[in-house]
């Protein structure tokens, strides 16, 4: 419990540093690392409670919205959104991490995740991590029509490619900053309007 109190304090302090400036502050939340029954030992309600506690602290700090990212399980992200909505009416953005076929580690398809989470009232949906911008653009283009029909804007937060190890043990990514940024117009032209980066 002490480490959670410390995390709450740090999250509050960081959020308070940015609140009130000419930008929006997102309360970023990641997976718990728990698997919900029957795939693990955690119950749905336990995971809802974990996210509600985090969201309550972030909400009290004055964040403008929540972003639950790097999700590998629709079941867990449903618990996250449920927990957040129990304590706050602020917008909730969700990004999933998927393989090159558009499936999470738990086997969930992106289109199914989008539909299920739209029913819970999320404000934006997309992907982060696991791909460079070229592959992520391909995956998200397949969701544009569905996202428009649901009224849920799409988010893209790719890596700068995948990391590679150098002979000296250091790592590098495929794309430099300029090459990475050059993909932005393609995302925008495809109807994907919330852009960022990951890793």
Predicted regions and their residues:
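Domain-level signal for soluble alpha/beta catalytic cores
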Residues: 1-199
């Amino acid at each position: 419990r002490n480490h959670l109190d410390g995390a709450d304090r740090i999250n509050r302090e960081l959020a308070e540093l940015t609140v009130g400036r000419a930008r929006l502050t997102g309360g970023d939340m990641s997976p718990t690392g728990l698997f919900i029954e029957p795939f693990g030992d955690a119950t749905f309600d336990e995971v809802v409670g974990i996210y509600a506690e985090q969201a309550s602290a972030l909400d009290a700090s004055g964040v403008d919205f929540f972003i639950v990212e790097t999700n590998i399980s629709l079941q867990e992200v449903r618990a996250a959104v449920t927990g957040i909505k129990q304590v706050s009416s602020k917008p909730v953005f969700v990004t999933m991490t998927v393989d090159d076929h558009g499936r999470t580690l738990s086997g969930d398809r992106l289109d199914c995740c989008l539909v299920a989470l739209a029913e819970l009232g999320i404000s934006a949906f997309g992907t982060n991590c696991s791909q460079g911008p070229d592959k992520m653009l391909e995956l998200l283009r397949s969701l544009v029509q569905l996202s428009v029909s649901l009224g849920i804007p799409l988010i893209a937060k790719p890596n700068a490619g995948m990391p590679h190890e150098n002979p000296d043990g250091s790592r590098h990514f495929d794309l430099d900053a300029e090459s990475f940024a050059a993909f932005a117009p393609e995302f925008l032209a495809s109807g994907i309007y919330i852009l960022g980066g990951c890793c």
